[in-house]
Amino acid sequence: MRLISLFIPLLFVLGCSKRSDSSTQIFGHAATGLNISNAIYHNNTREAIDYALSLPQCGGVEVDVRMDANGQLWLFHDQTLESSTDLNGAVESSTTAYLESGRYRSLKQEPLAALTSDLVNVLHKGKTFLDMKGSSVANKDSLLASLLSLNLDTAQFSLIVPTEALFHLFKNRFPTYLALHEFSDLSSSLLESEPELRGICIRNEKITREQVNFLKSIHKKTLIYEVRSPKGIASALNKNPEALLSDDLKLAIGLRY
C-alpha cells in the first residue's frame, strides 16, 4: 500500500502535461510563495528573491510593499509584525530604525527587506510586480514620492493596487493592475473609461478561461495567484493568463516549460 500511495501522486504530477502552447509567464508569489512549510527562505526576503531569480524560466517575482512611518518602503505581507517576526506592531506605524532591527522567526532568521536602490538592482534580473499593501489614500503623496525616488524602470516594474483610488494615483506613472476579490467587482465604467488600466490580479478560483479571454479582447491582462498544487497550476495555465504568481515556483515552471 505504501508504494501505491507514493505512485499515484507521482502519476498525477507526470500526467499534468506541459503547456507548450501557453504564453503565460511564471512569477514567484511573494518571491518564493506564501505559507509554504518547506520553503528554503521566508517570503518577501532578499534571500527569497535571489533564489527565485536564479531559477531558469522564472519571469520575475511579485512582492508585497508597505510604507513605514518615515516613508521607507518595505517588502512585507502581513498586517502585523508579530505574526512572523520578533517585532511588534505594524510596518505603517514603525520607524525605519525599528524595522531594520527585526528578523523573521524562520529557520534562517532573515532580516526584513527594505525596498532600496540596491534591491531594485537585484530585481532588474527579471520583471517585478509591486503589490501595494496597507496604503491608505491619506498618505498618497508620501507613498508616490517614495516610489518615484527609486527611479523604477516601468518596463520592468508594475504595480498591483487594492483600490480604484490608488489606481488613479499611480496610473500615469506606472503600469498598474487592480486587485479583485471577485471578477464581478470589475466595473464596466472603469474598463471603458480607463485605458491606462493594464489589467487585473485575481485568485485562480475566481476567474474562468472565458473571462480571461474577454479581458484579452479589450486589451487587458490577467495576473492569477493562489496556485500551489499540480491541479491548481494546471487549471490556471489552461486559462492562459498573462502571468501566474505561483506559491510553488519550481513546480509551476516544470509544468509550464
Q: What kind of feature is each model-predicted range?
A:
Residues S5-V13:
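Bacterial N-terminal signal peptides
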Residues C16-Y257:
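Phosphate-group recognition and catalysis centered on beta-loop-alpha active-site segments
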